[in-house]
Amino acid sequence: MSKKILTYIICFIASLACSKYSSGNDMDGNFGYISKPSTILYIYGGKNEEDYLGKLNASKYDSESIWNEYGKYGNKYNSKSIWNAYGKYGNKYNSYSPFNEHGSNPPVLRDKNGKFYGYFTANKYKSKRANYDLIDVICENYEEIREDVGDWYDKIF
């Protein structure tokens, strides 16, 4: 094999290892780059999207953020919080919960103008599922996240 081809192969492999799409976490539990929406997304749940559930990717200091443990939507005891294990949207067995792997009525993600960005769901077979690493990280770790939302915000963002 020529040096030029070998160099290209090595560069290609190195670029894959450093890819911005790598979503693994480091030894401290911090996540590398994960794909996140570039615009703030609002979560709506319920049969007709009648329940506002907070902002998916806002700062943990935003009062409407799901990452603000002192706010309505980041508090694991609030009925409109996805972190409430006993609530409609946080119980993994409820069809309206994003954490139900077979859920048929998961929350939707919309921007401030109402544009649809997909379903927020652990159900990987749901048509029009939101395709962000952030969704995967949340759905795979929600039980741990709900115990320390602020710390997880720091790990992810």
What are the residue ranges of the model-derived segments?
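Hydrophobic h-region of N-terminal signal peptides that target proteins for export
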Residues: 11-19
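Repetitive, compositionally biased segments used for assembly/scaffolding
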Residues: 21-157
